[in-house]
Design a protein with these regions (language model features):
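N-terminal chloroplast transit peptides
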Residues: 1, 5, 10, 17, ...
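Acidic/proline-rich low-complexity IDRs
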Residues: 9-12, 22, 27-33, 71, ...
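Rossmann-fold NAD(P)H-dependent dehydrogenase/reductase core
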Residues: 46-298
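Polar helix-capping/helix-linker motif
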Residues: 114, 132, 335-336, 361-366
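Active-site rim elements
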Residues: 251-259, 312-320, 359-365
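Short glycine/threonine-rich loop-to-helix capping motif typified by GTGT followed
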Residues: 296-299, 358-360
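Mobile gating loops/cap/lid regions near enzyme active sites that modulate substrate access
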Residues: 297, 301-309
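C-terminal helical subdomain
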Residues: 310-359
């Protein structure tokens, strides 16, 4: 099984990756002995001191020339909907270099023109297939080469697929149900590969995009069948390999597979906060930006649903939110100093940012 190693390797990350003091350089023995004898703990950093090589100095200069003072962001699912609107907001500040992780580079180029992205010199599209673990690893390797030693400041796990109308499971390149792999497992793998590097950044944040449908305490999650329910994760424990399609090990249900995957992504943010926030300084959070009823996410729903669902959400439930507004909300969680707190679930319903959304920011989320 490919799933078990991904999960277990992440939970067993070597703590040494986040820093520990050890006496590695014999030439500093005397100085360290004197420092320890005098309890001058401030000198202990010398135990790890390694003179920078010419190669490292050149790489640092190249990185400074390439990125300047901008923060480096990876945003998945940048070529449509929420991702495109969020990228535009990030670029508009001039403070971020955005790496758009997308499946279709030609489509991404068209969206850049259509959305009239500002500061295009600060945007770099890179290929990523979330239905392939190998592609995730390849993307992370390419990113490492691209950033020239600069630490990653933001990782926004936004990309997702929704296949509620399927009567049978579609499987990924790794023979795992597509929604579970794209929405959850591949993002999980990406986090595990990039997190040690992000710990070097001064103000790192990892943001996962959840869904109200994964929260059974809400009308959208607990009042609409099927309800997200992982049970004892028997499907995941069994390896999630075909023909197993559901995390709970039960028969396939397209809508529930989506809800379960989003629930796992939100739970992951909480788990990461509990296990790694203090060690790494990374702020882990998840967000539900409101119901983007006109989102391309619903492209596989029936035509009548796509026509009437936005009307229902706008005039009956009040939960409707425009893509532009949702993009601003995701941008805020990645950028706003008020959103630097870790372990927070940022949740908006409908309405403008000046209403309940601003109250959520002031209260520190949910």
């Amino acid at each position: 099984s490919q799933v078990a190693p991904i999960y277990s390797n992440f939970l067993n990350l070597n703590h040494c990756a986040f820093g520990s003091y050890s006496m590695r350089h014999q030439s500093l023995t005397l100085l360290l002995t004197l420092a320890c004898a005098s309890r001058a703990s401030g000198f202990k950093w010398m135990a790890n001191f390694k003179p920078p090589s010419i190669k490292n100095i050149k790489q640092q200069i190249d990185a400074d020339n390439k990125f300047g003072d901008t923060k480096l962001v990876v945003l998945t699912g940048t070529s449509s909907g929420l991702g495109a609107k969020t990228a535009k907001q990030l670029l508009n500040t001039g403070k971020y270099h955005v790496v758009g992780a997308v499946r279709d580079l030609d489509k991404m180029d068209a969206v850049v023109e259509l959305e009239d992205f500002p500061n295009r010199h600060l945007f770099t599209p890179m290929h990523l297939e979330l239905n392939s673990f190998e592609s995730v690893r390849s993307f992370c390797a390419s990113l490492d080469e691209f950033k020239l030693g600069k630490p990653l400041d933001r990782l926004i796990c936004n990309a997702g697929i929704y296949q509620p109308s399927l009567d049978h499971a579609k499987y990924s390149e790794d023979t795992i149900e597509q929604q579970v792999q794209v929405n959850f497992l591949s993002h999980f793998l990406m986090i595990s590969l990039l997190m040690p590097d992000m710990a070097r950044a001064p103000d790192p944040r990892i943001v996962t995009v959840g869904s109200v449908t994964g929260n059974d305490n809400t009308v959208g999650g607990g009042g609409v069948y099927p309800i997200a329910d992982l049970k004892k994760l028997e499907g995941l424990k069994a390896g999630l390999k075909k023909p197993i399609s559901m995390l709970d090990g039960y028969n396939f249900d397209g809508a529930k597979a989506y809800k379960d995957s989003k629930l796992c992504l939100m739970m992951t943010a909480n788990m990461l906060h509990d296990r790694y926030h203090k060690q790494t300084g990374i702020a882990f959070s998840s967000i539900y930006p409101g119901c983007i009823a006109e989102s391309p996410l619903f492209r596989e729903k029936r035509p009548w649903f796509r026509k009437y669902f936005p009307i229902f959400m706008k005039y009956i439930t009040g939960g409707f939110v425009e893509e532009e507004e949702a993009g601003m909300r995701l941008f805020q969680v990645a950028h706003d100093p008020r959103c630097s707190k870790s372990g927070v679930y940022w949740s908006w319903n409908g309405g403008p940012r000046e209403g309940r959304g601003e109250e959520a920011l002031e209260k520190g989320g949910q």
